[in-house]
Amino acid sequence: MNLNELPWLDKVYKKINFNNLPHGTIINGPEGLGKCILGNEIARTLLVNNNDSKSINLFNLNTHPDFLFLNKDKILTRHISFRDKEWDEELGNRNVIDFLSMTPSISTNKVVLINNAHTMNEVSQNALLKSLEEPAVNSYIILITNRSNSLLQTIYSRCQTLNMPSLTDDEINSWLVSRGISDFNTKDFPSYITPINILNDIENDQHMVFKDFVKLMKKFLSNQAHSKQILQHLSSYEIDLITKINYLIEFLKILLRSKILNEELSGLYKDFNNSDFSTLKVSNLINDLNNLRFDYFKVPQINENHVFNYYFSELKNSIKL
């Protein structure tokens, strides 16, 4: 997928002033909007001469000597600065600071693109900060983050931030139709879903999981299934803990909104119109789940069964169907 296929990114790209580009750029927004595609296109513009076929081929093959792409699930300190006796299977001893300290090989510039920059700990971020405070000439660092305010404020102060635009349901649905998808639309997914994630869910046969989750909640709250059965079913989903927590938060937010605004639920949620609950209790549950999600990013060893045992117990005590 390229920039021309993602109109919301193309608009952001066209507004970038490459004649006055700072050394650091942060691309921020939820997963599934194509932030890496935008970052890659910025890097291409900085490195590739369109009249130089060799440079174009090297970049397309991800072998351009003046481009370092850190695409790791978690960015470690050794990826940012040299650590003796620490070896990376893919990068070896290559790291951001050493890479940027060398003069360009075939281009005027050197560019580092870091995906999942929000996973860096404070030590890694402080190591990176040195390259932002005293940047080498013609060097550029592009950071991709899925979470706002996940980096040190000193990093934000030395970078420009490109925030991805929020898309309306109509914009997402129109894009899906342009990709040949008309059987599904945003109403079949959580409200926070992004277009590329919808596409991936459909291609990976995961597009019915959220609907199934809501049906599970109905069975559980109406005493048609006990918590052990629900937990077993949840464990069969090929999604991570954070996604399951997001599903639960989405479900509770829909019930809460309906209650506060006195709106009648329809479709998948119509059976919850008669649900009885305290808005304060459900609000507190949502806050607790949001805090749990934040804690998980710091301590990802949280036990999934313990988490859902606790919250299903709280749900049963809070919502009557």
Residues covered by each model-derived region:
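Residues immediately C-terminal
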Residues: 119-120, 134, 150
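Membrane-interface junctions
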Residues: 102, 106, 134, 295-298
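Conserved catalytic/switch belt of AAA+ P-loop NTPases
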Residues: 101, 126-143
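Charged, glycine-rich active-site and insertion segments that engage polyanionic ligands
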Residues: 1-59, 137-140, 146-321
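Clamp-loader machinery-focused feature within the broader ASCE/P-loop NTPase space
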Residues: 1-123
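Conserved adenine-binding aromatic site and its adjacent loop/helix in ATP-hydrolyzing domains
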Residues: 98, 130, 157
